[in-house]
């Protein structure tokens, strides 16, 4: 196993978490949380008024449903800090932006996939005033009087401390790019077990039952959309990563916008042809999009790629390009996992009149 960076114990926090874990979502792991719940609880001031938000490698203005609510939450805060590689939509609304170096300019903490350790190492120096995340947080910690929680000299020292129990050097790992420990034989009689109380596959989940949820799957009638509406579907494309790469000129040339897919039958009923401007409206908002008429979509659904419709003028290439699905999606949160259900929103579609 990788070594840990020495730290003193964290102080005990008695206040409830803003994301509802575990007081509202008892089964959601503490390290994951429920992102959209932070936004909603800031607005409701539940369980207390919030004053600031420190955001790292997240973009709630573009990634959360109901963008108007996210901006409403921001307006209730006194101070917002964003650490990111670009002036994304969330950074645009922040009081302070700390520019992070990109993955080509920094080390990251070592990652383990199955039994193999991989290293990400810089190939060029950071540009302008950007700094690696490990540097940013160490500097912040020291300036806040919390330097004991960041006991490493620099990025390479951080990685060396991680490697210490394995008996290999950082130079060896950098040269090879990965490390796989020697194979070992399993002890006789050792069996693989599942991460359940019984160690077996559980058709009846005592974990769910003890938290007040249905312990077995139950039948629920499928949600149906109202007449003249469509389920709004979204899905990523291979050319872009999450919401972070749309300002990259090379990737933008390949996927510059996000037309809305609609089946020929409902499109014909509405007089919509491929390439027409259309209005798309949900209970959350109304946006203009471009129609892509195709049989690759169900007649009761429409589809669009997320990550477009940026409002930050700092994104000189991506600003104003395409349509934001965040202006349409409503917030549906699974009570067990805390995940967002992004296929429940229904929309109306009509052609833009000339």
Predicted regions mapped to residue ranges:
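Extended redox/cofactor-interaction regions of prokaryotic respiratory oxidoreductases
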Residues: 1-92, 102-108, 123, 174-176, ...
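A signal for specific C-terminal beta-sheet/loop modules enriched in small/flexible residues
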Residues: 100, 217-222, 301-309
């Amino acid at each position: 196993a990788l070594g840990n960076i020495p730290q003193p114990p964290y102080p005990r926090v008695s206040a409830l978490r803003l994301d509802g874990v575990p007081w509202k979502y008892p089964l959601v792991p503490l390290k994951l949380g429920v992102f959209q719940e932070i936004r909603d609880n800031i607005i409701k001031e539940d369980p207390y008024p919030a004053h600031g938000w420190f955001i790292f490698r997240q973009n709630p203005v573009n990634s959360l449903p109901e963008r108007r609510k996210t901006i409403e939450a921001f307006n209730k805060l006194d101070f917002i800090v964003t650490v990111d590689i670009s002036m994304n939509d969330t950074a645009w609304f922040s009081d302070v932006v700390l520019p992070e170096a990109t993955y080509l300019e920094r080390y990251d903490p070592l990652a383990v996939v199955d039994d193999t350790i991989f290293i990400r190492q810089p190939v060029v120096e950071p540009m302008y005033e950007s700094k690696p995340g490990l540097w940013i947080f160490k500097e912040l910690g020291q300036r806040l009087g919390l330097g004991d929680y960041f006991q490493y000299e620099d990025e390479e020292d951080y990685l060396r401390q991680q490697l210490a129990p394995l008996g290999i050097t950082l130079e060896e790992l950098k040269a090879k790019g990965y490390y796989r420990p020697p194979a070992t034989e399993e002890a006789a009689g050792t069996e693989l077990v599942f991460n359940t109380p019984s160690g077996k596959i559980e058709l009846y989940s005592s974990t769910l039952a003890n938290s007040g949820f249905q312990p077995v799957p139950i039948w629920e009638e499928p949600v149906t959309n109202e007449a003249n509406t469509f389920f709004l579907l979204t899905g990523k494309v291979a050319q872009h990563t999450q919401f972070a790469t749309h300002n990259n000129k090379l990737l933008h040339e390949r996927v510059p916008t996000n037309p809305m897919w609609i089946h020929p039958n409902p499109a014909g009923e509405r007089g919509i042809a491929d390439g027409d401007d259309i209005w798309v409206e949900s209970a959350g908002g109304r946006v203009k999009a471009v129609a892509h008429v195709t049989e690759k979509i169900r007649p009761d659904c429409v589809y669009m790629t997320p990550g477009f419709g940026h409002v930050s003028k700092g994104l000189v290439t991506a600003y104003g390009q395409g349509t934001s699905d965040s202006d349409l999606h409503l917030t549906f949160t699974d009570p067990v996992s805390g995940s967002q259900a992004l296929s429940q929103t229904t929309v109306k579609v009509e052609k833009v009149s000339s």
